[in-house]
Amino acid sequence: ISWLQNLDDYALPDYSYFPSIDLYMDQVITFLEKQLQLIKIDDNPILTSSMVNNYVKADLLEPPEAKKYKTHHLINLLSICYVKQILSISDIKFIFSYLVKDETQSKKFYQILQHTYQNKIKDIQNDYLKKINQINLYNSTNDEQIAANLLQLAYDLSLEAEFKKIVAAKIISLTKNYDNKLDDKKSLKEIKKEQKKENKKNEKKE
């Protein structure tokens, strides 16, 4: 319960808090590890240099400049870490292609993320602190029943998370299909333009 009560301690920093100077890889890892403590469950690192390099290779993250990373690199890495257990790299890349096209968009995206994050923390505190307190209150003398009810709550949360994951996947899939149709239309227009050019050339020859 104390962990839930102290969720406010894990608030995401304001954009102005990010370093104004470019950082080397080890500095990036150190800075972001502090910001990602909320999702750290065990002793395994949340972010490593090899992960960052893989994101660059996958075109999910822009390459560093002279081995240094800028603010938008940090923001994008933070955004990746929060959803990488839910979304595939290709899906995150697709989302970024719409929402994080440049540094200006990256800043706006982070501000929306920060706002959503804070609201979700409040929702979680309001909803689940009440439920946990009710479990403890109604079963105050039965430790086994408390454990069973808490595990049932954990299972229900997992099920809810899975349903939300499915909805997110469906939305991304539908958007990808729409995106492909747009590409097909563009390709069709290009083909028609080329055909018109060829027809004009042939008419001139005749």
Predicted regions and their residues:
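Basic helix-turn-helix/winged-helix DNA-binding cores
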Residues: I1-V100
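Intrinsically disordered, low-complexity, charge-dense segments enriched in Lys/Arg
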Residues: I95-Y98, D102-E206
